Design a protein with these regions (language model features):
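Non-catalytic C-terminal interaction segments of nucleic acid-processing enzymes
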Residues: 125-221
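Nucleic-acid nuclease catalytic cores
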Residues: 86-91, 104-142
Length: 221
């Protein structure tokens, strides 16, 4: 139970870390049998250029048109797995889970929440990242302090000031950058399910010309 609570808290912190930088975040449903090797924990979207109007990001239509003309991707999509400070074999398992669940996206990233792994484990993760192209970042925080933070639900619901204070507790340390690859045009249709819901949301945002809020944030599948 404590392990599930810690993982939920780590996931909530990762979501808020991404969405406070203006990225779109889609949260996949949690598997009842543990972490999934088919789908990641999050999909993180790098939106097209635009300007904020109130709480909505409105896309620059001329920039979108230029992207279409040169065949550039309309947006970036990153597949993200979140781990609660794995070590040794657990760290490698989480890395390969990230690799396995990111084949559909432009890149994959493993986010470790907790204390920074030791030097040998960091070196091992960097070596794997260099070979397979998966990014690795640690949101560093002492275990004792992480336990003192509010629960996952409170972190998800935190207002701007409260969220900023929570994220100030974290020190992002990038161990390796992701390697980008091409995204297949029919990925959403091919995978279906939650992936289909994700790509339907993104398509609706492009058609509307602005970010359309994903109503439930957490997938209802």
């Amino acid at each position: 139970m404590a392990e599930e609570t810690d993982r939920a808290k780590a996931l909530a912190l990762a979501v808020r870390q991404y969405d406070t930088t203006g990225r779109g975040v889609f949260v996949f449903s949690t598997s009842e049998t543990g972490t999934s090797w088919v789908k990641p924990d999050l999909a993180v979207v790098e939106w097209p250029d635009g300007e904020w109007e109130g709480n909505a990001l409105v896309f620059d239509q001329s920039a979108l048109q230029r992207r279409r003309m040169i065949g550039a991707p309309m947006m970036g999509i990153r597949s993200v797995c979140v781990a609660r400070m794995p070590g040794g074999e657990d760290g490698r398992r989480e890395f390969f889970r990230t690799l396995a669940t990111s084949r559909w996206a432009q890149c994959g990233e493993l986010v470790i929440v907790g204390e920074l792994p030791d030097d040998s484990e960091c070196a091992a993760l960097r070596g794997l990242a260099a070979e397979f192209g998966v990014g690795v970042v640690c949101l560093e925080i002492a275990d004792e302090r992480l336990c003192e933070l509010p629960g996952a639900e409170e972190i998800f619901k935190a207002g701007d000031e409260e969220c900023a204070a929570l994220l100030a507790e974290l020190t992002p340390v990038r161990l390796a950058s992701s390697r980008l690859k091409a995204l297949e045009a029919d990925t959403g249709e091919t995978l279906g399910g939650e992936f289909g819901a994700l790509f339907d949301w993104l398509a609706a945002c492009l058609e509307r010309g602005s970010v359309e809020e994903y109503e439930f944030r957490v997938s209802c599948y």
